[in-house]
From Swiss-Prot:
This is Large ribosomal subunit protein bL33. The keyword Secreted does not apply. It comes from the Bacteria. GO terms for molecular function: structural constituent of ribosome. Belongs to the bacterial ribosomal protein bL33 family. Pfam families: Ribosomal_L33 (PF00471). One of its GO terms (cellular component) is ribosome. InterPro entries: Ribosomal_bL33, Ribosomal_bL33_sf, Ribosomal_zn-bd. Keywords: Ribonucleoprotein, Ribosomal protein.
Length: 49
């Protein structure tokens, strides 16, 4: 079963992206994505929606 999660910028705390992940995976997602508020690529970590 897949659950919906948000991706939050580690630098500014802005939630920029939403995605899904497999519920059985316990590790938090950590992806390098573009943040329009910071105007650069930063790491984004998983948060609850």
């Amino acid at each position: 079963m897949r659950v919906q999660v948000g991706l939050k910028c580690e630098e500014c705390g802005n939630r920029n992206y939403y995605t899904t992940k497999e519920k059985s995976k316990k590790d938090k997602l950590r992806l390098k994505k573009y943040c329009p508020k910071c105007n650069k690529h930063t790491f984004h970590t998983e948060t609850k929606v």
